[in-house]
UniProtKB/Swiss-Prot annotation:
Residues 365-377 have a biased composition (Polar residues). Residues 1-151, 184-208, 316-813 are annotated as: Disordered. It holds the Pfam family MAP7. The gene is MAP7D1. It comes from Homo sapiens. Microtubule-stabilizing protein involved in the control of cell motility and neurite outgrowth. Facilitate microtubule stabilization through the maintenance of acetylated stable microtubules. The keyword Cell membrane does not apply. This is MAP7 domain-containing protein 1.
């Protein structure tokens, strides 16, 4: 290809004039014997005209190996040789080519349809058309690749966005699932807590009901036992035998009429009896009492007036109580368990065993811990054998009393009996000292006391001579018995006047028993009973003032009516185990009285005792009602207080639960809010990271495009330099040919650019010597076309689809140069400014 231009340069025509004139489009290629040089816009057809500047990188170095396929035989990086045809002929020869055809498919029709120029050699025209077509194909392929790349990036971005949406939806779903699980856990925990509280409440209610029922049972049982134990002391006096009736009549003194000097003994005995009652087995069953129940029991344990009256009567009449207590069985101590049995069955002796035929003492029958059994030995050991035989005879003869067997004592009861016996021994010693002191004080006895003592001594041999009747065989004899010594006998002690005067109830019962007694006693018993009744009346006559001073607060005189000779013997009897005495009281009651005054006196005494009994019972009932009322009020107050405390506790518990629940909900909300904020922060960080990744990716792509663009610019610069030199040589040869053959092109060039023609005329000789400014003059239109694009009609790389418009825009360049004075100065300026334009690109 280079051989043609070099041959044309050797033709010898002057080419300097035509080298600087741009070619003018001709109307038709047929009429021109010599076609003009191609326009400058067709020199570098790199990229398609409709590509934006940012997408120039598509024409990378990958497309450059396509250029050696052209049959032009060019060697080097030149993309396209100069075109020989005019733009109009090129447009005609191009025709309606499809945009999607490849470069290999488009070559044969372009070779066949392209007319060969007449003046240009045949080796130049086919490579030019092929290069143009290849450039168009490359542009189209580059455009397609850019579109595919854009589609790929859009699809990738859509995939990224879709993945991000999926991840966001998954995070939301996980958060909702976590919230749901937490809510379910909270509900389950609340249900479990509510069920646990309900079970605890039911358990507390059940325990409370059971505890209240146990307390009620314990209180009722304790109160019933205490009432039974306390009132049984008085009840035993009314339900027992006539001997007990007499002792009950003695004990019916009110508390106001008791003497003052007995208070210390009563207080001692009361404290001991309270301790005994408190430590009893019935108390041990209800030890688990609260404070207020203990206070109630303590209040109930305080002595009443009747209790003090009985205690004072026991102290006032110690001789009778001690004599009666001597017949107490060792197995029948003052135990609470056998008190009710002795009250219900009455004191019946055991007839089967010879040593068991012992009457029960009245104090042990009444289950009173205050009056102990003085002696544990039975009456058989102190009485003579004859008396024992006489006593057993009427019982064996025809006694209607049933046989009573004593139950076996358990080890616990034996231990209790031993403890009570020790306490009784202590009380006996204290009472013995007190009585001995009183006996010393009452040594000068009154003649009435001596008289009663003499009558008692007279009655004692009679009572010894006769056996006891079946009705009186259950009671203890009241008179002293002789000492167990063989030859030594104690002087008999007289009974007290109150002991001789029996109560009206006792007399009535004696009459009934006398009627019911068997008639086998005989006339001897009747005569003896009559004599005994007359003696009793005689002894009761001097002792009649004894009941009258009973209401007075002065002490009763029975203790003082004892002879002084009895003091040492009585002390000896008390220190040693005393023996029972034969009975002094009449064993058979009299049928009635014939004295009107005696009957009136007995009736008045009976009425007085009944009135006192009613008053005592009424007072005790009032006190009991007050105690019950006070107890009920206290119980109601305690229940109200406990209920208020429970309600306050329930309110406090509910408030505490509400606070805990609110705190738990607040903590849960804070935790959920914190989790939400953390999730949002993580999502923001993820989005920021993805955005930075995309930006980095886009920057990398942009950098790659810039690098490709720079490489392309460098290639374009090298290509332009080589093309400018070749084009200048071709134009010189063409101008020389044109000047030699036809002058019309020269005229046209002169008409269009007179300033440039003048410059070419002035400097036609040193063309090869001035390549410094001639090369930029050729490069100026190309730089304007390929660089800045001053006109909107031009496309990016100077390749236009409509050739005439591009030629017209190039034809304006000499008109813009007209206002300057000299074209040389403008060209010099253009030479200076053109490198700056290239640097900006």
């Amino acid at each position: 290809m280079e051989s043609g231009p070099r041959a044309e340069l050797g033709a010898g025509a002057p080419p300097a004039v035509v080298a600087r004139t741009p070619p003018e489009p001709r109307p038709s290629p047929e009429g021109d014997p010599s076609p003009p040089p191609p326009p400058m816009s067709a020199l570098v057809p790199d990229t398609p005209p409709d590509t934006p500047p940012a997408m120039k990188n598509a024409t990378s170095s990958k497309q450059l190996p396509l250029e050696p396929e052209s049959p032009s035989g060019q060697v080097g990086p030149r993309p396209a040789p100069p075109q020989e045809e005019s733009p109009s002929s090129e447009a005609k020869s191009r025709g309606p080519t499809p945009p999607a055809m490849g470069p290999r498919d488009a070559r044969p029709p372009r070779r066949s349809s392209q007319p060969s120029p007449t003046a240009v050699p045949a080796s130049d025209s086919p490579p030019t058309k092929q290069e143009v077509k290849k450039a168009g194909e490359r542009h189209k392929l580059a455009k397609e690749r850019r579109e595919e790349r854009a589609k790929y990036l859009a699809a990738k971005k859509a995939v990224w966005l879709e993945k991000e949406e999926k991840a966001k939806a998954l995070r939301e779903k996980q958060l909702q699932e976590r919230r749901r699980r937490l809510e379910e856990q909270r509900l389950k925990a609340e249900q479990r807590r509510a069920a646990l509280e309900e079970r605890q409440r039911q358990k507390l209610e059940k325990n409370k009901e059971r505890y209240e029922a146990a307390i009620q049972r314990s209180v009722k049982k304790t109160w019933a036992e205490i009432r039974q134990q306390r009132w049984s002391w008085a009840g035993a006096l009314h339900h027992s035998s006539p001997g007990h009736k007499t002792s009950g009549s003695r004990c019916s003194v009110s508390a106001v009429n008791l003497p003052k000097h007995v208070d210390s003994i009563i207080n001692k005995r009361l404290s001991k009896s309270s301790a005994t009652l408190w430590n009893s087995p019935s108390r041990n069953r209800s030890l688990q009492l609260s404070a207020w129940e203990s206070s109630i029991v303590d209040r109930l344990m305080t002595p009443t007036l009747s209790f003090l009256a009985r205690s004072r009567s026991a102290v006032t009449l110690p001789r009778n109580g001690r004599d009666q207590g001597r017949g107490c069985d060792p197995g029948r101590g003052p135990t609470w368990g056998r008190a009710g049995a002795s009250l219900a069955r009455g004191p019946q002796p055991d007839r089967t065993h010879p040593s068991a035929a012992v009457p029960v003492c009245p104090r042990s029958a009444s289950a009173s811990p205050l009056t102990p059994c003085s002696v544990t030995r039975s009456v058989h050991r102190c009485a003579p054998a004859g008396e024992r035989g006489e006593r057993r005879k009427p019982n064996a003869g025809g006694s209607p009393a049933p046989v009573r067997r004593r139950p076996e004592a358990s080890p616990v009861q034996k231990k209790e009996k031993k403890d009570k016996e020790r306490e009784n021994e202590k009380e006996k010693s204290a009472l013995a000292r007190e009585r001995s002191l009183k006996k010393r004080q009452s040594l000068p006895a009154s003649p009435r006391a001596r008289l009663s003592a003499s009558t008692a001594s007279e009655l004692s041999p009679k009572s010894k001579a006769r056996p006891s009747s079946p009705s009186t065989s259950w009671h203890r004899p009241a008179s002293p018995c002789p000492s167990p010594g063989p030859g030594h006998t104690l002087p008999p002690k007289p009974p007290s006047p109150r002991g001789t005067t029996a109560s009206p109830k006792g007399r009535v019962r004696r009459k009934e028993e006398a009627k019911e007694s068997p008639s086998a006693a005989g006339p001897e018993d009747k005569s003896q009973s009559k004599r005994r009744a007359s003696n009793e009346k005689e002894s009761a006559a001097p002792a009649s003032p004894a009941p009258s001073p009973a209401p007075s607060p002065t002490p009763a005189p029975p203790q003082k009516e004892q002879p002084p000779a009895e003091t040492p013997t009585d002390a000896a009897v008390l220190t040693s185990p005393p023996a029972p005495a034969p009975p002094v009281t009449p064993s058979k009651p009299m049928a009635g009285t014939t004295d009107r005054e005696e009957a009136t006196r007995l009736l008045a005494e009976k009425r007085r005792q009944a009135r006192e009994q009613r008053e005592r019972e009424e007072q005790e009932r009032r006190l009991q009602a007050e105690r019950d009322k006070r107890m009920r009020e206290e119980q109601l107050a305690r229940e109200a207080e406990a209920r208020a405390e429970r309600e306050a506790e329930a309110r406090r518990r509910e408030e505490q639960e509400a606070r805990e629940k609110a705190q738990a909900e607040q903590e849960e909300q804070e935790r959920l809010q914190k989790q939400k904020e953390e999730a949002e922060a993580r999502s923001r960080e993820e989005a920021e990271r993805q955005r930075l990744e995309r930006e980095k990716h886009f920057q990398q792509q942009e950098q790659e495009r810039q690098e490709r663009r720079k490489r392309l610019e460098e290639i374009m610069k090298r290509t332009r330099k080589s093309e400018v030199s070749e084009t200048k040589q071709k134009q010189d040869s063409k101008e020389a040919n044109a000047n030699g053959s036809s002058p019309e092109p020269v005229k046209a060039v002169e008409a269009r650019s007179p300033g440039l023609q003048k410059e070419a005329v002035q400097k036609e000789e040193p063309i090869p010597q001035e390549p410094q400014w001639s090369l930029p003059s050729k490069e100026l239109p190309a730089s304007l076309v390929n660089g800045l694009q001053p006109l909107p009609a031009h496309q990016e790389n100077g390749f236009s689809t409509n050739g005439p418009s591009g030629d017209k825009s190039l034809s304006r360049t000499p008109e813009t140069l007209l206002p300057f004075a000299e074209a040389e100065a403008f060209l010099k300026k253009a030479v200076v400014q053109s490198p700056q334009v290239t640097e900006v690109l």
